Amino acid sequence: MKKKFRIAVLPGDGIGPEIMREAYKILNILEKNFSLPLEIREFSVGGIAIDREGIALPEETLRGCENSDAILFGSVGGKKWDYLPIESRPERASLLPLRKHFNLFSNLRPAKLYSDLKNLSPLRSNIVRNGFDILCVRELTGGIYFGKPKGRSKNENGEYSFDTEIYYDFEIKRIAHLAFELASSRRCKVCSIDKSNVLASSILWREIVEEVSKNYPNIILSHLYIDNACMQIIKNPSQFDVLLCSNIFGDIISDECAMITGSIGMLPSASLNSKKFGLYEPAGGSAPDIEGKNIANPIAQILSLSMLIRHSMNLNEIADKIDSSVYRALKAGYRTLDISDGKNYIKTNEMGDIIAKFLINGK
């Protein structure tokens, strides 16, 4: 008997449980129709965990994740918990500790504009007529967000604050290797984003990326300063394949790429460590304003599951089938509210049913 692949499911808050229910439909098909040996266990996280147990990341949840091969995450947070100190709120007290505990140093954020949804993009039609497919590879555990010293103080000149951008060569090497490896199965292009005309950390970044690139002669490497990159993405997004970014630059660029697709409800993400253990989640938030209305778009959650199948289970063919099922649903004209004309749209559960049907029929 094949060893079961263990998935910890953390639905979370807001629309998290609603869109996770649609991902469960896909998981059930993978078990029954594709004969994947899966062991799925669900745990509480975020605000709902605070309400139940007084903490956003309960010990049982952390241990459950430790005993799993991957984490499928929903969303956390909401105004209900804004009274708490920032460090105790659902977002800060669950996601960040999980990333740190499992050393999830890389964040993968695909931004794809489907040809049938070109009208959603805020960019002109002549810019997006061919669509685009960008993968932002962001270093997640180093850089200015974690560098020390940082703080706030006063002197004779007044009050001041400071942060420190620190990158070690090994941190740059491992994220660069991942970007090149991912590019080799895409269009074989990596564009590294830095600010090496100003920042010492970016000078090292560019040097290390150039060094790593010598191991991948089939990959075309280019470099852009962060300010120029932001402009080029607006001007011609289809020129890009894989974007390799430091923590802060990746934070900026990935959100820009997300917005020009027209709907963040379509976008998945993955955070991986060196052993391909990953946390997979939609790029959007918990959207408490539409919680319980059955109008949330479940596609980002379903595509996050597809990324789990691809990167942690290494089952590219099955992941391709899930992606294709999503595309076929869109091609057939099915739309949730966020990607519709506001009049003709289907509910959250209906979109999940339709994608599941395409997956079964396309097996």
Curated annotation (Swiss-Prot):
Cofactor note: Binds 1 Mg(2+) or Mn(2+) ion per subunit.
Residues annotated as binding Mg(2+): 227, 251, 255
InterPro entries the record matches: IsoCit/isopropylmalate_DH_CS, IsoPropMal-DH-like_dom, Isopropylmalate_DH
The keyword Transmembrane belongs to this UniProt entry's keyword annotation: no
Cofactor(s) required, per the database record: Mg(2+); Mn(2+)
Coiled coil: none
Keywords: Amino-acid biosynthesis, Branched-chain amino acid biosynthesis, Cytoplasm, Leucine biosynthesis, Magnesium, Manganese, Metal-binding, NAD, Oxidoreductase, Plasmid
Binding positions (NAD(+)): 78-91, 285-297
One GO CC term, this protein: cytosol
Catalytic reaction annotation: (2R,3S)-3-isopropylmalate + NAD(+) = 4-methyl-2-oxopentanoate + CO2 + NADH
GO process annotations (BP): L-leucine biosynthetic process
Pfam families: Iso_dh
Site residues, Important for catalysis: 145, 195
Binding site for substrate: 99, 109, 138, 227
Cellular location(s): Cytoplasm
Major enzyme class: oxidoreductase
EC number annotated for this UniProt entry: 1.1.1.85
PANTHER family the record matches: 3-ISOPROPYLMALATE DEHYDROGENASE (PTHR42979:SF1)
Role played: Catalyzes the oxidation of 3-carboxy-2-hydroxy-4-methylpentanoate (3-isopropylmalate) to 3-carboxy-4-methyl-2-oxopentanoate. The product decarboxylates to 4-methyl-2 oxopentanoate.
Subunit annotation: Homodimer.
Cited HAMAP family: LeuB_type1
Similarity-based family: Belongs to the isocitrate and isopropylmalate dehydrogenases family. LeuB type 1 subfamily.
Name of this protein: 3-isopropylmalate dehydrogenase
Source organism (scientific name): Buchnera aphidicola subsp. Rhopalosiphum padi
Gene: leuB
